[in-house]
UniProtKB/Swiss-Prot annotation:
Keywords from the named record: Isomerase, Magnesium, Metal-binding, Phosphoprotein
Official protein name in the record: Phosphoglucosamine mutase
PTM per Swiss-Prot/TrEMBL: Activated by phosphorylation.
KW Transferase (keyword) present: no
CDD domains per UniProt: GlmM
One example GO MF annotation: magnesium ion binding
Binding positions (Mg(2+)): S104, D243, D245, D247
Enzyme class: isomerase
Species this chain originates from: Cutibacterium acnes (strain DSM 16379 / KPA171202)
CC terms in the record's Gene Ontology section: cytosol
Amino acid sequence: MARLFGTDGVRGVANQDLTAELALDLSVAAAHVLGEAGAFGHRQPTALVARDPRASGEFLEAAVCAGLASAGVDVLRVGVIPTPAAAYLVNEYRTDLGVMLSASHNPMPDNGIKFFSRGGVKLPDDLEDAIEQRMGEPWARPIGDKVGRIRYTPQAVDTYVDHLVRSLRQQDTLKGMKIVLDTANGASFHTATAAFTTQGAEVIAIHDQPDGLNINERCGSTHPEKLQAKVVEVGADMGLAFDGDADRCLAVDHEGNIVDGDHIIAILALALQEDHRLASNTVVATIMSNLGLIIAMRAHDIHVDQTKVGDRYVLESMNANGFSLGGEQSGHVIMSEFATTGDGVLTGLHLAARVARTGKTLKELASVMTRLPQALINVRGVDKLRAGIDPDVNKAVADANQKLGDAGRVVLRPSGTEPVVRVMVEAGTQEEADQICSELAETVKMSLAL
C-alpha cells in the first residue's frame, strides 16, 4: 500500500481521496502520537489550524478541529492564510502543533493536510509514519474539562503582515514603486496587498477575489501570462505571482519578462552577501537549478550546495548547515532568518526592496545570471532503478558531459512516483541542448525498456 503522506503532507481530490472522515482520523491520531512522543509535556496542548480559500477547506477544517478537540487539544482557528503564515504563527503563538489545509498550486478540486510541529517546522518522516499506522485505533477519549476548546483568532492576519513588514527593517522601503501582485485567488489575497502597501508601494492587485472555486485558475505563478501583460499595460516597475498557498513566488520585470526562482536566488544572494548576512557564503539549490546560477554565484565567490529536487531537501541542508538562503527554480525560496519554510510574499518583498535600494530595474538585477538553454525529456515506461547503473546509459552520459565541458551538463533523474527517467541537458545553445537531450533520451529508452 502506498504511503499516505507524500513529500508535502497528505493530498488528494477533496471528498474523494481526502474525506472528512480521513481528516478527522488523521487529526485524532496526530494528537495522540505527538502526545505519546512528548511533544505536549504535561499541559493542555494547543494547535493552530489554517486553510487556503478552497471550498473544500471549510468542511476539512471542521473535521480537523473536531478531531483535535475530541483528543483534548485546544484549537486556534486562524482562517484563510498562506502556508508560510501558518508555520510562522505556530512559532509566534507557541502552539504545540499546526495544521495547514491546502493543495498549494494544484487545481481547485484537490486539497491537502500538512502538519507542523512546535516551532513551525514540518513533522519528521517517522512521526508521519506513526500517525498513518495508528489511524483508527480505539484511543482513550478525554471527557469533561479535558476536552479541547475551539476558538477563532482574527488577529492572526495582522500578526503575520506585521512580521513581513518588519523583516525589511525600515519603513516605506518600497515608496515610489508600482508593483502588480497576482495572488492566484489564493491565500495571500489580503496579506500580500497589505504588506506591500504598508511598505509604501502602489499596488495593483489581480486575481485577488477568491470565491472558493477559482484558486489557481489560469492565474498565479503557474500561469503568469496575465501578470506579464498587466505589468506592461500599467507601466509597473515589476510584478509578482504567488501560488494558491503563497509558498512560492515568480517575478516579472518592467518589460514583462519572467524572473524565475534561480534568478531570484541569485539577486537575493548578492543582497545578503553585501549585508554580511549570507551564512557561510553559501546558497542551497537543487540539481535541477540552472547551471547559470552556479556560474553566476561562482563569479562572486558564493558556493552553491546542490540537493535532490524538492524544497524539503533544500530546507534539510539549510537546517543542517545553518545556511540562510536556498530554493528552487519554481520559486520556492527560503530565507531562514525570517521563515521556516518557503514564503512567496516574504521573498517578493525582499526582491522589491533590492530593486528600490539599488535604483536598478529588476531586469538589470536579473542580468547577474545568464540562464543556459535547457532541454528536458521525460522518458516513460523504463526501469528507473537501472538509470544509474546501466553501462550504455552511463557511457552516453559521460560522452555528453565530455562534449559539453564546462559549458553545460547532463542530469538524469528517476521519478519518485512513476516509471519515468527525466533527462535534462544544459548547453551553450538551445539547438545543442535539444540534440544531446534527444540522443540521450533515445539511449535511455532503448537500454532501460521494461
